[in-house]
Protein backbone atom coordinates (compact mmCIF):
# COMPACT_ATOMS: atom_id res chain seq x y z
CA UNK A 1 0.00 0.00 0.00
CA UNK A 2 1.56 3.30 -1.04
CA UNK A 3 1.58 6.26 1.35
CA UNK A 4 -0.58 9.33 0.77
CA UNK A 5 0.58 11.49 -2.13
CA UNK A 6 3.10 14.13 -1.14
CA UNK A 7 1.18 17.41 -0.92
CA UNK A 8 3.46 20.37 -1.57
CA UNK A 9 4.44 22.67 -4.42
CA UNK A 10 7.01 20.22 -5.75
CA UNK A 11 4.73 17.17 -5.50
CA UNK A 12 5.05 16.22 -9.19
CA UNK A 13 8.81 16.03 -8.82
CA UNK A 14 8.58 14.04 -5.60
CA UNK A 15 5.97 11.71 -7.06
CA UNK A 16 8.34 10.99 -9.95
CA UNK A 17 11.20 10.24 -7.55
CA UNK A 18 8.88 8.09 -5.44
CA UNK A 19 7.91 6.12 -8.57
CA UNK A 20 11.57 5.53 -9.40
CA UNK A 21 12.11 4.12 -5.91
CA UNK A 22 9.23 1.65 -6.31
CA UNK A 23 8.85 0.97 -10.04
CA UNK A 24 11.69 -0.92 -11.82
CA UNK A 25 10.74 0.67 -15.17
CA UNK A 26 11.30 4.15 -13.73
CA UNK A 27 14.75 3.26 -12.41
CA UNK A 28 16.68 4.23 -15.57
CA UNK A 29 17.02 7.85 -14.42
CA UNK A 30 19.00 6.92 -11.35
CA UNK A 31 20.47 10.20 -10.16
CA UNK A 32 18.94 13.56 -9.65
CA UNK A 33 19.31 16.85 -7.86
CA UNK A 34 16.07 18.14 -6.38
CA UNK A 35 15.89 21.86 -5.62
CA UNK A 36 15.31 24.39 -4.41
CA UNK A 37 13.37 23.91 -1.17
CA UNK A 38 14.20 25.59 2.12
CA UNK A 39 16.36 23.59 4.52
CA UNK A 40 13.34 22.58 6.60
CA UNK A 41 11.38 21.52 3.51
CA UNK A 42 14.40 19.58 2.26
CA UNK A 43 14.54 17.68 5.57
CA UNK A 44 10.84 16.83 5.32
CA UNK A 45 11.25 15.69 1.70
CA UNK A 46 14.25 13.56 2.68
CA UNK A 47 12.21 11.88 5.41
CA UNK A 48 9.35 11.20 2.97
CA UNK A 49 11.66 9.75 0.33
CA UNK A 50 13.47 7.64 2.94
CA UNK A 51 10.13 6.22 4.10
CA UNK A 52 9.14 5.55 0.46
CA UNK A 53 12.41 3.71 -0.21
CA UNK A 54 12.03 1.60 2.95
CA UNK A 55 8.42 0.84 1.98
CA UNK A 56 9.75 -0.37 -1.37
CA UNK A 57 12.07 -2.76 0.49
CA UNK A 58 15.28 -0.88 -0.33
CA UNK A 59 18.27 -0.26 1.90
CA UNK A 60 18.85 3.43 2.56
CA UNK A 61 22.12 5.04 3.62
CA UNK A 62 22.04 6.16 7.26
CA UNK A 63 24.29 9.14 6.48
CA UNK A 64 21.79 11.97 6.35
CA UNK A 65 23.71 14.95 4.97
CA UNK A 66 26.26 15.52 2.24
CA UNK A 67 28.33 17.55 4.73
CA UNK A 68 28.61 14.50 7.00
CA UNK A 69 29.63 12.24 4.10
CA UNK A 70 32.20 14.76 2.83
CA UNK A 71 33.77 15.18 6.28
CA UNK A 72 33.97 11.38 6.73
CA UNK A 73 35.54 10.94 3.28
CA UNK A 74 38.05 13.76 3.84
CA UNK A 75 38.98 12.43 7.29
CA UNK A 76 39.39 8.89 5.95
CA UNK A 77 41.67 9.86 3.08
CA UNK A 78 43.62 12.29 5.28
CA UNK A 79 44.42 9.38 7.61
CA UNK A 80 45.34 7.18 4.66
CA UNK A 81 47.73 9.84 3.35
CA UNK A 82 49.29 10.36 6.79
CA UNK A 83 49.93 6.63 7.18
CA UNK A 84 51.31 6.35 3.65
CA UNK A 85 53.69 9.26 4.27
CA UNK A 86 55.02 7.83 7.55
CA UNK A 87 55.54 4.26 6.30
CA UNK A 88 59.17 3.29 5.92
CA UNK A 89 60.05 2.57 2.33
CA UNK A 90 62.67 -0.05 1.65
CA UNK A 91 63.72 -1.42 -1.72
CA UNK A 92 62.07 -4.74 -0.76
CA UNK A 93 58.67 -3.41 0.34
CA UNK A 94 58.34 -0.31 -1.82
CA UNK A 95 55.52 2.18 -1.30
CA UNK A 96 52.50 0.59 0.42
CA UNK A 97 49.54 0.08 -1.89
CA UNK A 98 46.05 1.34 -1.15
CA UNK A 99 44.90 -2.26 -0.60
CA UNK A 100 47.63 -2.75 2.03
CA UNK A 101 46.70 0.52 3.71
CA UNK A 102 43.03 -0.48 3.87
CA UNK A 103 44.08 -3.60 5.79
CA UNK A 104 45.99 -1.40 8.26
CA UNK A 105 44.25 -1.52 11.67
CA UNK A 106 44.72 2.25 12.04
CA UNK A 107 42.29 2.65 9.15
CA UNK A 108 40.08 -0.44 8.99
CA UNK A 109 38.87 -0.15 12.59
CA UNK A 110 37.44 3.28 11.93
CA UNK A 111 33.68 3.70 11.84
CA UNK A 112 34.15 6.17 8.97
CA UNK A 113 35.19 3.43 6.55
CA UNK A 114 32.13 1.31 7.35
CA UNK A 115 29.84 4.28 6.87
CA UNK A 116 31.46 5.27 3.58
CA UNK A 117 31.06 1.72 2.28
CA UNK A 118 27.46 1.63 3.51
CA UNK A 119 26.68 4.85 1.65
CA UNK A 120 28.29 3.50 -1.52
CA UNK A 121 26.42 0.16 -1.33
CA UNK A 122 22.93 1.16 -0.11
CA UNK A 123 20.18 0.81 -2.74
CA UNK A 124 19.23 4.45 -2.21
CA UNK A 125 21.38 7.34 -0.96
CA UNK A 126 19.46 10.49 -0.01
CA UNK A 127 21.78 13.34 0.94
CA UNK A 128 20.75 16.81 2.11
CA UNK A 129 23.04 19.21 0.23
CA UNK A 130 23.90 22.79 1.17
CA UNK A 131 25.57 25.31 -1.14
CA UNK A 132 29.06 24.78 0.32
CA UNK A 133 28.83 21.03 -0.34
CA UNK A 134 28.64 21.67 -4.09
CA UNK A 135 31.85 23.67 -4.36
CA UNK A 136 35.48 22.59 -4.49
CA UNK A 137 36.48 19.37 -2.73
CA UNK A 138 32.93 18.65 -1.57
CA UNK A 139 31.60 18.67 -5.14
CA UNK A 140 34.41 16.36 -6.26
CA UNK A 141 33.67 13.86 -3.48
CA UNK A 142 29.94 13.87 -4.30
CA UNK A 143 30.65 13.39 -8.02
CA UNK A 144 32.92 10.41 -7.29
CA UNK A 145 30.28 8.94 -4.97
CA UNK A 146 27.60 9.40 -7.63
CA UNK A 147 29.72 7.88 -10.42
CA UNK A 148 30.55 4.89 -8.22
CA UNK A 149 26.88 4.35 -7.42
CA UNK A 150 25.80 4.81 -11.07
CA UNK A 151 28.18 2.01 -12.12
CA UNK A 152 26.48 -0.21 -9.53
CA UNK A 153 23.00 0.82 -10.80
CA UNK A 154 22.05 2.54 -7.54
CA UNK A 155 19.79 5.53 -6.93
CA UNK A 156 21.36 8.76 -5.66
CA UNK A 157 19.18 11.69 -4.62
CA UNK A 158 20.78 15.00 -3.70
CA UNK A 159 18.29 17.26 -1.96
CA UNK A 160 19.78 20.66 -2.67
CA UNK A 161 18.53 23.59 -0.64
CA UNK A 162 19.66 27.18 -1.06
CA UNK A 163 20.03 29.35 -4.13
CA UNK A 164 20.39 28.30 -7.74
CA UNK A 165 23.85 29.85 -8.11
CA UNK A 166 25.15 27.33 -5.57
CA UNK A 167 24.42 24.48 -7.99
CA UNK A 168 25.92 25.93 -11.17
CA UNK A 169 29.44 24.69 -10.39
CA UNK A 170 28.41 21.05 -10.10
CA UNK A 171 25.60 20.79 -12.66
CA UNK A 172 27.64 20.87 -15.92
CA UNK A 173 29.74 17.92 -14.78
CA UNK A 174 26.88 16.11 -13.14
CA UNK A 175 24.37 15.39 -15.95
CA UNK A 176 21.29 14.31 -13.98
CA UNK A 177 17.95 15.98 -14.57
CA UNK A 178 17.69 19.13 -12.51
CA UNK A 179 14.22 19.43 -11.07
CA UNK A 180 12.87 22.88 -10.33
CA UNK A 181 9.95 23.73 -8.13
Where are these regions (language model features)?
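Hydrophobic, Leu/Ile/Phe/Ala-enriched alpha-helical segments that form helix-helix packing faces
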Residues: 18-25, 49-53, 80, 84, ...
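Well-ordered, non-membrane alpha-helical segments in soluble/globular domains
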Residues: 11-17, 45-47, 109, 142
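Conserved beta-strand segments of the P-loop GTPase G domain that flank and frequently precede/overlap
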Residues: 34-35, 63-64, 127-130, 157-161
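Walker A/P-loop
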Residues: 32-67, 71-86, 92
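A short, basic N-terminal segment
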Residues: 1-31, 55-56, 176
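Residue-level preference for the first positions of well-ordered beta-strands
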Residues: 29-35, 93, 124, 155-157
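Glycine- and charge-rich intrinsically disordered segments
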Residues: 1-5, 82-98
Amino acid sequence: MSPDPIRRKGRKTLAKVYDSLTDPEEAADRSRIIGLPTKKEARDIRDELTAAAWAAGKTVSRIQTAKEYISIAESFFRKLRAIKNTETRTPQTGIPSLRELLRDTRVTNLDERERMIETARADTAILLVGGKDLRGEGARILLILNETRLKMGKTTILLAHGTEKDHKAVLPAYKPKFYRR
